């Protein structure tokens, strides 16, 4: 077995373990049956993406089930998602943790779509830009009330 195949096998084994640890072994099997070439390309292309996939197996499974891996997210998708996600975050820690994890999951999706030629460069950069804009808007909205009260 050559080094590339060993690397792919190691990465996919790492994913299988992560899915099994959160009781998603059957879902991992389904992913392997339906998108193994794409998972292989992801494993070859990005150690970071595999790391994030293994950190958030539920999120990746949900992206797959909902068809998010195969379709673009038109504006104002990220503004709407961040508004919902961050609405109940009342501490700096929870707010920052939530937005960081959301960004990591979005990056996993973008890398998956990019390395598998499932999106155009224009779609990818538009989504990246919108998430950046939405993140800035969310940070301003979160910070403005305490700042107004203070000053």
Role assignments for model-derived ranges:
Residues 1-151:
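Non-catalytic regulatory/linker segments of enzymes
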């Amino acid at each position: 077995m050559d080094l590339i195949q060993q690397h792919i096998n190691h990465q996919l084994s790492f994913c299988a373990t992560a899915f099994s640890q959160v009781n998603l072994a059957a879902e991992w099997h389904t992913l392997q049956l339906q998108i193994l070439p794409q998972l292989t390309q992801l494993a070859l292309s990005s150690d970071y993406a595999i790391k994030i996939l293994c950190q958030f197996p539920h999120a990746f499974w949900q992206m797959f089930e909902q068809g998010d891996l195969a379709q673009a997210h038109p504006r104002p998708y990220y503004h709407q998602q961040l508004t919902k996600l961050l609405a109940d975050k009342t501490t700096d820690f929870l707010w920052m943790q939530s937005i960081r994890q959301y960004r990591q999951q979005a990056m996993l999706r973008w890398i998956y779509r990019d390395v598998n030629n499932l999106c155009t460069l224009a779609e990818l950069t538009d989504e990246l830009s919108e998430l950046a804009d939405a993140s800035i808007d969310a940070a301003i909205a979160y910070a403005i009330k305490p700042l107004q009260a203070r000053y």
